[in-house]
């Protein structure tokens, strides 16, 4: 699996240390193991997880601006854990409303020695502890849902980072809250079939 990860990272032009690579491989192994009992992801094959979960998360890394981020509807820690491994200088809150997912994340953090992640079991609308430089998610079906549920989370300079498959302009027009579209970045994920986009949105100051 490590060789496959090395190859994918090289194709994506992402530079990581050996320790970071071992943490990513360890995370996939844990996800594969826990998935058999807890059904955390529909992706069953560890090699596929490297593409659809790890690389799909890591390609966002170079676009992150700021130091503290929240991953809303993180599921088993995606994109939060791969991004936290790749950015040990940044802090990540991983939010999910399902206990088994947070239990898995806590276990993974402990086993992999990841110290820059705080897992939180909560519904997003009830989480009011702090604001963030970036609100990340690949969980929401629509941009309107993401902005609506998470509108209280960015700080005044903060952004929404929506990880999407196909991007449709009409989705931005459907957003009810005041928002402006900063940019849409096409993402290239090695060996992934289909389009990926990162949509950056800002609240007006």
Curated annotation (Swiss-Prot):
Instruction: List the GO cellular component terms.
Output: cytosol
Record's signal peptide? none
- Which Gene3D superfamilies does the UniProt entry name for this protein? Vaccinia Virus protein VP39
Localization (cell): Cytoplasm
Q: Which Pfam families match?
A: GidB
Q: What is its EC number?
A: 2.1.1.170
Domain of life per record: Bacteria
Keywords attached to this entry? Cytoplasm, Methyltransferase, rRNA processing, S-adenosyl-L-methionine, Transferase
> Enzyme group, top EC level?
transferase
Q: Which GO terms describe its molecular function?
A: rRNA (guanine-N7-)-methyltransferase activity
What this protein catalyses is: guanosine(527) in 16S rRNA + S-adenosyl-L-methionine = N(7)-methylguanosine(527) in 16S rRNA + S-adenosyl-L-homocysteine
- Binding sites annotated in the UniProt record for S-adenosyl-L-methionine: 73, 78, 124-125, 138
Primary localisation category: cytoplasm
Q: What does this protein do?
A: Specifically methylates the N7 position of guanine in position 527 of 16S rRNA.
Stored HAMAP family: 16SrRNA_methyltr_G
Give the family per the record.
Belongs to the methyltransferase superfamily. RNA methyltransferase RsmG family.
The protein's name: Ribosomal RNA small subunit methyltransferase G
Q: Which organism is it from?
A: Actinobacillus pleuropneumoniae serotype 3 (strain JL03)
């Amino acid at each position: 699996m490590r060789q496959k990860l090395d190859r994918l990272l090289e194709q994506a032009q992402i530079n990581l240390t050996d320790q970071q690579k071992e943490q990513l491989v360890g995370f996939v192994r844990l996800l594969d193991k826990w998935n058999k009992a807890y059904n955390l992801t529909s992706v069953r094959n560890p090699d596929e997880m490297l593409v659809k979960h790890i690389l799909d998360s890591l390609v966002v890394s170079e676009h992150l601006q700021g130091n503290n981020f929240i991953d809303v509807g993180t599921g088993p820690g995606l994109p939060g854990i791969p991004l936290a491994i790749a950015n040990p200088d940044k802090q990540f809150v991983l939010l999910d409303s399902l206990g088994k997912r947070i239990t898995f994340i806590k276990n993974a953090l402990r086993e992999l020695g990841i110290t820059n992640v705080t897992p939180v079991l909560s519904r997003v609308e009830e989480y009011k502890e702090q604001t963030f430089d970036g609100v990340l998610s690949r969980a929401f079906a629509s941009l309107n849902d993401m902005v609506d549920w998470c509108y209280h989370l960015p700080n005044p300079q903060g952004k929404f980072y929506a990880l999407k498959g196909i991007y449709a302009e009409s989705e931005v027009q459907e957003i009810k809250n005041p928002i402006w579209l900063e940019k849409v970045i096409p993402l290239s994920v090695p060996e992934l079939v289909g389009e990926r986009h990162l949509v950056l949105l800002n609240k007006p100051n």
